[in-house]
């Protein structure tokens, strides 16, 4: 079992146990405040930035020192004996500070790796850029795919138990329970989606940390099954079962979950062509084997979610599709398998015969209807795809308006450079171009036709610059040589901004 440690333990042997006293340090709240100011624009900043001050931090720490019991009921009013009249503000500050504290063990782990004091081999981690070579090279060899949505909400206590692998300080875990009490109804087994939405907006940093911890625990078990399934029949399954139910406090015995013939069931998991790919909360399972094998995986996933994470999952919502007949949506692309049939005549001595040759090719398309829906959501067009003016940008200068539209258009072409057919992107370019013109024409309160006639045909020439021409201007020699030697798709891996369709809702 020593060779399985990289998959199962996730290197949880940190000795930085005393995290709870940091909640009484002023600099923690300063860090949290700075991180809130520098937060990515993909996350809505609804924090306390405009109200935070060092005086409020000192007052909060003083009140926490004076308290004998740091417990607040979720049903209390905004006024309580700890926070006084500023419960929402103080609770927000503590939760932001706690989000910084629980990330410290991971930061120390990263710093030690960068300094070379210890070199860690992460078996379960891959970059998002590895997905594109996977689609290009490996996907044509597979036959079946299943879309898997990682289920949530999850039982609150399971979240705390998962963090016990990383955070050894019991006081910090009790503080986490305090915040979960504050945001959710502790008496329910399933967190309502509306509470998840409130919590993710009020404290996105802590929400992402808890969610990523949940996904990491789930994938550590799933990838163990994937990578070591061929060794299960050769080793004792006791450690495997003990790892899945890591506390021994769950009511269901192992024998009830996996029947007595579990080694026979695990025997069918042996498959070297099983692939697992995930981005955010959506993942895919793809295999070269039969649908029976895919149903086996669906069976294990449902048992894992229901008996280990106490999350109800409906097996009927996990569809197993044949790649040559169905397409699936992932990372903003619609991907499917094309089979090109050809007949080859072969002659051997005096005998000649015909052979059917089937060539598989992955087809990645731009979801034009979903892109139009995304543009409609951002008020660039209506539901039918008719361009409208961006009224919120009308107060900006002409240069800023044009630069914003051109940047959006080029980013979309840049992201979908790996698409098999780019004709649908020209409709998106048309929508953005006319939306830009209508936004500019909104300023002098003239019509679009008058505005175009006044400025001439050279208006917005940036929109007509092809993505290939832009790349050839940046890399003149390298790009031209690459195009001559390779006529297929070119995946641009220097993606710094993911479009809205990629983010799983």
From Swiss-Prot:
Coiled coil: none annotated. GO terms for cellular component: chloroplast. InterPro entries: Domain_X (IPR024937), Maturase_MatK (IPR002866), Maturase_MatK_N (IPR024942). It comes from the Eukaryota. It holds the Pfam family MatK_N. It is found in: Plastid, Chloroplast. GO terms for molecular function: RNA binding. Keywords: Chloroplast, mRNA processing, Plastid, RNA-binding, tRNA processing. GO terms for biological process: mRNA processing; RNA splicing; tRNA processing. Usually encoded in the trnK tRNA gene intron. Probably assists in splicing its own and other chloroplast group II introns. Belongs to the intron maturase 2 family. MatK subfamily. PANTHER family: MATURASE K (PTHR34811:SF1). This is Maturase K. It comes from Morus alba. The lineage of its organism: Eukaryota, Viridiplantae, Streptophyta, Embryophyta, Tracheophyta.
């Amino acid at each position: 079992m020593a060779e399985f440690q990289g998959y199962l333990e996730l290197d949880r042997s940190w000795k930085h146990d005393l995290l709870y006293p940091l909640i009484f340090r002023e600099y923690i709240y300063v860090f949290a405040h700075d991180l809130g100011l520098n937060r990515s624009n993909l996350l809505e900043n609804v924090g306390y930035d405009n109200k935070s001050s060092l005086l409020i931090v000192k007052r909060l720490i003083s009140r926490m020192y004076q308290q004998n019991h740091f417990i607040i009921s979720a049903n209390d009013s905004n006024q309580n004996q700890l926070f006084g009249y500023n419960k929402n503000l103080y609770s927000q500050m503590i939760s932001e500070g706690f989000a910084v504290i629980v990330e410290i063990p991971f930061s120390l782990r990263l710093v030690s790796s960068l300094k070379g004091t210890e070199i860690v081999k992460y078996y379960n981690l891959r970059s998002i850029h590895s997905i594109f070579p996977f689609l290009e090279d490996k996907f044509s060899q597979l036959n079946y795919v299943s879309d898997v949505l990682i289920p949530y909400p999850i039982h609150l206590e399971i979240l705390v138990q998962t963090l016990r692998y990383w955070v050894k300080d019991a006081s910090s875990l009790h503080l986490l329970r305090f915040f979960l009490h504050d945001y959710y109804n502790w008496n329910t087994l399933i967190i309502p989606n509306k509470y998840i939405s409130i919590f993710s907006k009020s404290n996105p940093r802590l929400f992402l940390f808890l969610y990523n911890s949940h996904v990491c625990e789930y994938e550590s078990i799933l990838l163990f099954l994937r990578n070591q399934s061929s060794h299960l029949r050769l080793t004792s399954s006791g450690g495997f079962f003990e790892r899945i139910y890591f506390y021994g406090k769950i009511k269901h015995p192992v024998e009830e979950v996996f029947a007595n013939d579990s080694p026979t069931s695990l025997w069918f998991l042996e498959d070297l062509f099983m692939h697992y790919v995930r981005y955010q909360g959506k993942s895919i399972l793809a295999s070269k084997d039969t649908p029976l094998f895919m149903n086996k995986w669906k069976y294990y996933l449902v048992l894992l979610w229901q008996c280990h994470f106490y999350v109800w999952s409906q097996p009927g919502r996990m569809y197993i599709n044949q790649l040559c007949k169905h397409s699936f949506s992932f990372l903003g692309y619609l991907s499917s398998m094309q089979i090109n049939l050809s007949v080859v005549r072969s002659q051997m001595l005096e005998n000649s015969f015909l052979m059917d040759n089937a060539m598989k090719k992955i087809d990645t398309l731009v979801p034009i209807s979903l892109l139009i829906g995304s543009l409609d959501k951002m008020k660039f067009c209506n539901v039918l795809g008719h361009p409208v003016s961006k009224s919120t940008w009308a107060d900006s200068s002409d240069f800023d308006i044009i630069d914003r539209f051109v940047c959006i258009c080029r980013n979309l072409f840049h992201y979908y450079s790996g698409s098999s057919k780019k004709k649908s992107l020209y409709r998106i370019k048309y929508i953005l171009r006319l939306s830009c013109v209508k936004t500019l024409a909104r300023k002098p309160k003239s019509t679009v036709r008058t505005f175009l006639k006044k400025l001439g045909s050279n208006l917005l020439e940036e929109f007509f610059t092809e993505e290939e021409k832009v790349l050839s201007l940046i890399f003149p020699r390298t790009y031209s040589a690459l195009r001559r030697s390779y006529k297929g798709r070119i995946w641009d891996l220097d993606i710094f901004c993911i479009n809205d369709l990629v983010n799983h809702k």
